Amino acid sequence: MRPFDLIRFKQSGRPITMLTAWDCLSAALVEAAGADVVLVGDSLGMVALGHATTLPVTLDQMLHHTLAVARGFTASHDQQPLLVCDLPFLSYQCGPDLAVAAAGKLLKESSAAAVKLEGADPEIVAVVDRLVRMGIPVMGHLGLTPQAVHRLGYRRQALDPVSQDRLIEQALTLEKTGCFALVLEHVPSELAARARHELGIPVIGIGAGDDCDGQVRVTADLLGLTPHQPPFSPPQLNGRQLCIEALRGWIQEHQSSSPTTAPPQAEPDC
């Protein structure tokens, strides 16, 4: 899978599916399930590393997990999902030079084929422009942007006409600058539908309604492995409880099969 395949899918009306992975086991699962795109998201900071937000995740951690995900794929290279890696907080916001170094490290040292970054302020647009000019495919991300949690929170975004027009303008700017796809998170469904019809690149939604070119979900949320799931990402099964019950069953079976009599006590030396 390559970035241009997603644009072809949009043109043909084929829905795009994108799931996250954070290690070789989760990668093997989402590949076997048939996901078009596998995102090594900085959400791994919360799913796998126990942080409260995505902000503490480092570039080295993203590289470490991307390498693990790549090792989890079993199909031939041309049959593998498109592997996209998040650029973590402050690896690209400080300017194009640092962004090229960070994105280049991820693509050179792992099997990632593209990077994803958040926002569309002028500074970010300049970063996208430089990355694209350097031959690095970029996926954009607007709406609820988790790296801006301290400024925007986890609230639904773009609720009024002015902010909606601004988001569409930002999306068009990202497309013009060279992004091959755009994630829209936690925005009104009518806004996502508008973006889908105004943009030539795929609009991939999460909490943005069904009228998108594709959908992305955090795999751990879909499997019900996390204690709490966002309202826009209901689990497909109660994986957490199933795992607990399986582990508890093994523990109880092991305990019940243990000898009921205590081993003889050793005689004291004196």
UniProtKB/Swiss-Prot annotation:
Binds 1 Mg(2+) ion per subunit. The active site is at 185 (proton acceptor). Mg(2+) binds at residues 42, 86, 118. Pfam families: Pantoate_transf (PF02548). Its cofactor is Mg(2+). 3-methyl-2-oxobutanoate binds at residues 42-43, 86, 116. Its EC number is 2.1.2.11. Keywords: Cytoplasm, Magnesium, Metal-binding, Pantothenate biosynthesis, Transferase. One of its GO terms (molecular function) is 3-methyl-2-oxobutanoate hydroxymethyltransferase activity. Pathway: Cofactor biosynthesis; (R)-pantothenate biosynthesis; (R)-pantoate from 3-methyl-2-oxobutanoate: step 1/2. Catalyzes the reversible reaction in which hydroxymethyl group from 5,10-methylenetetrahydrofolate is transferred onto alpha-ketoisovalerate to form ketopantoate. Homodecamer; pentamer of dimers. This is 3-methyl-2-oxobutanoate hydroxymethyltransferase.
